[in-house]
């Protein structure tokens, strides 16, 4: 399912790369995770079956696990809002009812390993987001670092920024708090995942404000927002066997279509990507995935 239509029951106020967001009332939003998948800031023309359900269940797992206030409103959405019943087949298993908060306009990225764009920057300048890093090789573990980016509008590209630039956007005091919270959350999740055979190389958090409280929002530690590696096959100095979008990115790059609009994934790429998401879910939660 790559799009939703609630036929005006609630207004659609935003359509992200994956999520359709509906306004329930002044204080409440409905997040619906579709099966859309994006890579290199472009949405593929076809989706990954039930990917939205996997992301939703995994986010719920981490919301429960992590010791921080989050935006989730628990309960059966169809009991709370009977008018949604006709759309059960669109919403069930892939919807989260959440508090509407003031969003902090940063992509809060924490890196515990040098890979991806961080590795590319390091090769040029021995820095990651302007932070000097000692001598390392690809995929090497480092002390976790906060590497924010701008939160771009749909169709625009997020831009990597320094901590000092982030300070100017949200204020130094708030940015310092966000940095500490994000690194603490990453570290707790990383240590847990290690017991399940998964390395969390990096991840992206998003936060909102409820008064002065920093609240965890959006999705949390999913294969869409993180790099998950197979710990059993981890080998420093090379690219890793992963449970995330890297498989799709590699296919796009090798076929010369990275960043191009309207690309359709062949069935084998869809199937393999789905299996990686399912494996990540099952390893991290200990639960068997049920379609």
From Swiss-Prot:
Signal peptide: none annotated. Pfam families: SAICAR_synt. Its EC number is 6.3.2.6. It catalyses: 5-amino-1-(5-phospho-D-ribosyl)imidazole-4-carboxylate + L-aspartate + ATP = (2S)-2-[5-amino-1-(5-phospho-beta-D-ribosyl)imidazole-4-carboxamido]succinate + ADP + phosphate + 2 H(+). Keywords: ATP-binding, Ligase, Nucleotide-binding, Purine biosynthesis. Pathway: Purine metabolism; IMP biosynthesis via de novo pathway; 5-amino-1-(5-phospho-D-ribosyl)imidazole-4-carboxamide from 5-amino-1-(5-phospho-D-ribosyl)imidazole-4-carboxylate: step 1/2. PROSITE patterns: SAICAR_SYNTHETASE_1 (PS01057), SAICAR_SYNTHETASE_2 (PS01058). InterPro entries: SAICAR_synt/ADE2_N (IPR028923), SAICAR_synth (IPR001636), SAICAR_synthetase_CS (IPR018236). GO terms for molecular function: ATP binding; phosphoribosylaminoimidazolesuccinocarboxamide synthase activity. The keyword Nucleotide-binding applies. Belongs to the SAICAR synthetase family. HAMAP family: SAICAR_synth (MF_00137). This is Phosphoribosylaminoimidazole-succinocarboxamide synthase. It comes from Candida maltosa (Yeast). The gene is ADE1.
